[in-house]
A protein has these predicted regions:
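Conserved acyl-donor/pantetheine-binding loop and adjacent beta-alpha core of acyl/acetyltransferases
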Residues: 85, 101, 109, 113-142
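Conserved acetyl-CoA-binding loop-helix of GNAT-fold acetyltransferases
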Residues: 146-149, 155-172, 177, 191-195
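Conserved active-site alpha-helix within GNAT-family acetyltransferase domains
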Residues: 184-202
């Protein structure tokens, strides 16, 4: 008769212990956020290019085309920032990236407006600021990254269309596989990449310091 009662008490004690631990973990995370620390989890996705690429039908008529040097004078790109720190409307940083020959920016156009874009890295090294690491890609390995679809055009399969065009480009050039990096809380992007045949290969965790960085940057500007 004692054993069932003991088991019940034991289970309640275990639940209470786990609850206390979870409270400590949550409290610890809140304190870390308040002082400027944050855990960033990035998922690395990979996709072999010998697998068929799904055909995507968007809900709107979309034209996907590369951003070219002469496009810097095109009015539809005036207020669009393809690269952080771009000097609009000159797009100086974007043009340098395109001119390097290592990268290309694919732009989705809907009714004469930019709906979104995605970057392709053909060869070389990519720096991920969110997790503060550099990844070098071998010959035959490409990177599809910095996917961005503007709010008015989301849920129209435009993200998948951009990924589709990126994969098709890499496959036409004889690449073997394609990578991408997505933050673990960015569910729309995760679903888009998984829907295009990507699968997670690893999770990278980084402890970032945000408030200290901002203060440091502010002091450096004085």
């Amino acid at each position: 008769m004692l054993m069932p009662g003991y088991s019940l008490i034991d289970k309640l004690h275990l639940k209470l212990t786990l609850w206390r631990r979870s409270r400590f973990i949550l409290a610890g995370r809140r304190i870390m956020r308040r002082i400027g620390f944050k855990y960033v989890r990035m998922i690395e996705f990979v996709r072999p290019l010998d697998a068929p690429i799904p055909i995507i039908e968007t809900k709107l008529k979309v034209e996907v085309r590369p951003f070219l040097t002469e496009d810097s004078e095109n009015k539809i790109y005036d207020r669009i920032c393809f690269t952080p720190g771009d000097n609009l409307p000159l797009h100086d940083k974007t043009l340098r990236r395109v001119a390097s020959g290592n990268e290309e920016c694919l732009v989705a156009i809907v009714n004469g407006e930019v709906a979104g874009y995605i970057w392709l890295l053909f060869i070389g090294t990519n720096y991920e600021p969110a997790i503060e690491i550099e990844e070098t890609f071998a010959e035959g390995e490409g990177l599809v990254y910095q996917l961005n679809v503007f709010a008015n055009y989301r849920k129209k399969y435009i993200a998948k269309k951009l990924i589709n065009n990126g994969l098709s480009y890499f496959k036409s050039k004889g690449y073997r596989k394609c990578y991408s990096y997505v933050e673990s809380d960015n569910m729309p992007s995760i679903k888009s990449f998984e829907g295009m045949g990507f699968h997670p290969s690893r999770v990278i965790t980084c402890l970032r310091i945000f408030k200290f960085k901002r203060k440091k940057e502010a002091n450096s500007q004085r």
